[in-house]
Amino acid sequence: MQHVNHSSFDKASKAGFIIALGIVYGDIGTSPLYTMQSLVENQGGISSVTESFILGSISLIIWTLTLITTIKYVLVALKADNHHEGGIFSLYTLVRKMTPWLIVPAVIGGATLLSDGALTPAVTVTSAVEGLKVVPSLQHIFQNQSNVIFATLFILLLLFAIQRFGTGVIGKLFGPIMFIWFAFLGISGLLNSFAHPEVFKAINPYYGLKLLFSPENHKGIFILGSIFLATTGAEALYSDLGHVGRGNIHVSWPFVKVAIILSYCGQGAWILANKNAGNELNPFFASIPSQFTMHVVILATLAAIIASQALISGSFTLVSEAMRLKIFPQFRSTYPGDNIGQTYIPVINWFLFAITTSIVLLFKTSAHMEAAYGLAITITMLMTTILLSFFLIQKGVKRGLVLLMMIFFGILEGIFFLASAVKFMHGGYVVVIIAVAIIFIMIIWYKGSKIVSRYVKLLDLKDYIGQLDKLRHDHRYPIYHTNVVYLTNRMEGDMIDKSIMYSILDKRPKKAQVYWFVNIKVTDEPYTAEYKVDMMGTDFIVKVELYLGFKMRQTVSRYLRTIVEELLESGRLPKQGKTYSVRPDSKVGDFRFIVLDERFSSSQNLKPGERFVMLMKSSVKHWTATPIRWFGLQFSEVTTEVVPLIFTANRGLPIKEKIELTTTGD
């Protein structure tokens, strides 16, 4: 997934328009497959609905899309870009310095977005495959729901299996396919609307408000739980800002919105014209002439796959950002594409696959999945509203205006949350359990890092310059390596982790010409790549601080190569000639990276709650990427040393020598 050129961020182009259709609108664009079906089924079936119910339902959909998707996300949230990047974690990095507790909505919003993403592929692909039930030549096969489940699972297996290869060339087809999809939605919806053109009266919000309080609405205000299905993809629209640019979203959204609304109007008109067609039919597929049904099912399946692909890729991006912000475990990541936007995280991929397939097997039909869908994303939207309010205050918008906006969207999304909360007992508990599990892991990881930062023992490097210099010239010890590089998470000024000096001096002393201490600082900007060097008045100690954006890969060896060359050219680092080398012009000696595998000991003197957090973090750490992979050191010379995580000077436990008194005979 390529990122938009920053110079064209606010501009729109024909190519950008098509790309946006393939990346941004998959989720919201496939909602017509199941939203109207959910509304009708909750009312008792096609034969039970009235014209006022259809008008009210379409009106609620139109105004939900207008208020939440258009106003909140397209017009307001897209302004909250972090150096042209969007999404809840990008928004968090913009405002996190305002108050520490903003980590709470960021963690909750990220976890619920990730958990809801596991349900989306299940419901969209199942809905598309169920369309085969109305294909005359295939009805005898797919009327059996077991065959629908088998086909859905097969598609999902293929989808998740190819993630490791990246989207590559096939990704270029997503935009044109989705253009055809939206064109079909608009045209078919318009043609079906001619049967009952009064459906266009639904643009008047009166019909929606009337339905909410009408006795013929069997669900009452809880009908909004089904209405919300129409706008679940709004958060993904904001998350993909960096991939397509603000200008292309502004231009493409009106086209998408009109196509979606026409589809709902067309389905509504068909229902009014065919009230005796049967309660089990999906209005979306039933409204298509039978000779085109097979083609539409194929197109719908492709659209569902593209929507699922966008959400899976979005999940990888979301987790990558959280890992670099140090609020999520550092799982192994690979980069199958040629650009920074394509990330593949095996653990997350197969976690999502397991959850998605389990949901298909548990709920079996798209109707049952819809009953669980949307609950978590309402929480994500509420968390985004909180963070967005702080962003607007930071930008100088009047507090009164921000408060009004926060109250308006808070109440609106709060109502949708309450309406969706009824889904908890109908399957919504699944995504809530997943979200709570993710939140638990994020809290453990975040709190564990804070505990280490608070208690870990640091030493002043200046106090050890003399010892390091003496070791360099001590002929009793053989040269360990020309350059020894320590990667540290903790370096504050001249203070470094005690474990590092323990490794150099207290174990077998590591004699080297140059000692490197490298620390990575993640910046609030997404694509920063800068460094600072402090040699502490020597030519044998190099402190390097790498400033990398939260979307940048932390491949230390490649950055260090550039830094070494620049230090040699400036004369700050003495040339290190090699006697033996295939490169006669080589100016630098060999490098050995030392990775310290810090192990927490339960004997550390911590409070019970802190001990629990550290023990849990140690358990989670077994599943994470090794530092060698995380820092891109697979092809470098690396030594991994197991060291204790030193919080305080470990005092010996109290013990007394047992002295036996001996008696001597008289």
Curated annotation (Swiss-Prot):
GO annotations of cellular component type: plasma membrane
Database matches in Pfam families: K_trans, K_trans_C
Record-level Gene Ontology MF annotations: potassium ion transmembrane transporter activity; symporter activity
Catalytic activity: K(+)(in) + H(+)(in) = K(+)(out) + H(+)(out)
Major subcellular location class: membrane
Parts of the chain that traverse the membrane: 16-36, 58-78, 99-119, 141-161, 167-187, 221-241, 253-273, 292-312, 343-363, 373-393, 402-422, 424-444
Assigned keywords, A-Z: Cell membrane, Ion transport, Membrane, Potassium, Potassium transport, Symport, Transmembrane, Transmembrane helix, Transport
Presence of keyword Cytoplasm: no
Localisation: Cell membrane
Keyword Thylakoid: no
Family listed: Belongs to the HAK/KUP transporter (TC 2.A.72) family.
HAMAP family reported in the protein's UniProt record: Kup
Reported function: Transport of potassium into the cell. Likely operates as a K(+):H(+) symporter.
Descriptive protein name: Probable potassium transport system protein Kup
Native source species: Streptococcus agalactiae serotype III (strain NEM316)
Name of the gene this protein is made from: kup
